[in-house]
Amino acid sequence: MGLFGMMAISTSALSAERERAEVTSANLANAETTHTQNGGPYVRKEVVFSAANASPFQTVFNGMGSDDEPAGSVSISQVVNDTTPPVMRYEPGNPDADAKGYVAYPAINPVSEMVDLMDATRAYQLNASAISAAKQMVQESLDILKTT
């Protein structure tokens, strides 16, 4: 795999991590949303990653140093709804309360969502750094060619 293959992998990871950060931010923003267009509380969403163009390790290992093998990348296979039931809170004066006075709130833990958001941010930063390093290697290679 060449430098451009490395850049393609990191670029796909940037896109996937950006989407994960957006979904996590939406979860945080709607942590107290008790009424949606569907009538119930907001449902937490989760991003599922998948490997695209993945090859078995032995195939990649045998092809080391050649550009014939397409680079693998990461993609988002789907965004799924969390199946955790809503948290019921007793609030008899709330307009969204049921007959017993309970309101269904999303099963979202803001602390774990913040950890997920920080994780997505760090992964994004690392992939951006990998792209910068690959660009710097290409630039230095061009500089070497200019001097010869």
Regions found by a protein language model. Give the residues of each.
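Amphipathic alpha-helical polymerization modules
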Residues: 1-148
